[in-house]
């Protein structure tokens, strides 16, 4: 059984960013909530949209920050502090340039890889990087100078379909993670590639 108590989906706020690659983490949390017939509601004290799920008999909070990406740690730290949730009880879903669309991977800890949302969360959790991550592949534009425009752009439908399929599999693997353990969830998710 997993000890995850908070699942966060990283995003930029507002309709103009809703369909951009950088919001893939929020797409995952929205899909997870939908699969349990829940919706997220804005809760200003946590600087985001929140919900509460019973996942495999465990009480789990969901959070999509309404801060800009580079301030995501403010929301995560507010909720973690209020509910006394430790970093290793947090799963952060985020877009990942180093994975192709259609692939998602779980991991514990590590650096921020240049991701400003992860960078701020690590900082606001007292420079503690030891939280779980769900890395949702969005691909890479091939040139570092094009990354900002790429993550703030909308994927073409062919890529969106692959990302959505990986997110659906990640939702199924989250249930395995909660019922069983991280290793079983990782083994299944890491074997998946949307085609």
Curated annotation (Swiss-Prot):
Catalytic residues (UniProt): 22 (proton acceptor)
Keyword annotations: Cytoplasm, Hydrolase, RNA-binding, tRNA-binding
GO-annotated biological processes: protein quality control for misfolded or incompletely synthesized proteins; rescue of stalled ribosome
Keyword tRNA-binding attributed: yes
Root EC class: hydrolase
E.C. number: 3.1.1.29
Matching SUPFAM superfamilies: Peptidyl-tRNA hydrolase-like
Gene3D superfamilies attached to this UniProt entry: Peptidyl-tRNA hydrolase (3.40.50.1470)
GO molecular function: peptidyl-tRNA hydrolase activity; tRNA binding
Cellular localisation: Cytoplasm
InterPro entries attached to this UniProt entry: Pept_tRNA_hydro, Pept_tRNA_hydro_CS, Pept_tRNA_hydro_sf
One Pfam family hit: Pept_tRNA_hydro
Residues at the site labelled Discriminates between blocked and unblocked aminoacyl-tRNA: 12
Gene Ontology CC: cytoplasm
Site (Stabilizes the basic form of H active site to accept a proton): 95
Catalytic activity: an N-acyl-L-alpha-aminoacyl-tRNA + H2O = an N-acyl-L-amino acid + a tRNA + H(+)
Binding site for tRNA: 17, 68, 70, 116
Protein family (similarity comment): Belongs to the PTH family.
Quaternary data: Monomer.
Function: Hydrolyzes ribosome-free peptidyl-tRNAs (with 1 or more amino acids incorporated), which drop off the ribosome during protein synthesis, or as a result of ribosome stalling.
Stated name of the protein: Peptidyl-tRNA hydrolase
Gene transcribed to yield this protein: pth
């Amino acid at each position: 059984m997993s000890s995850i108590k908070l699942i966060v989906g990283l995003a930029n706020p507002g309709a103009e960013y809703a369909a951009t690659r950088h919001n893939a983490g929020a797409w995952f949390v929205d899909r997870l909530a939908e699969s349990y017939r829940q919706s997220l509601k804005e809760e200003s004290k946590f600087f985001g949209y929140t919900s509460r799920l019973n996942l495999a008999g465990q009480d789990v909070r969901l959070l999509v920050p309404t801060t800009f990406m580079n301030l995501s740690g403010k929301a995560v730290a507010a909720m973690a502090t209020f509910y006394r949730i430790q970093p290793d009880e947090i799963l952060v879903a985020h877009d990942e340039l180093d994975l192709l669309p259609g692939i998602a991977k779980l991991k514990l800890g590590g650096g921020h890889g240049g991701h400003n949302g992860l960078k701020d969360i690590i900082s606001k959790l007292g420079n503690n990087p030891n939280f779980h991550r769900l890395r949702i592949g969005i691909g890479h534009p091939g040139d570092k100078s094009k990354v900002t425009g790429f993550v703030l752009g909308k994927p073409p439908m062919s890529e969106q379909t692959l990302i959505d399929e990986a997110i659906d599999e990640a939702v199924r693997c989250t249930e395995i993670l909660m019922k069983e353990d991280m290793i079983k969830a990782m083994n299944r998710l890491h074997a998946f590639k949307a085609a």
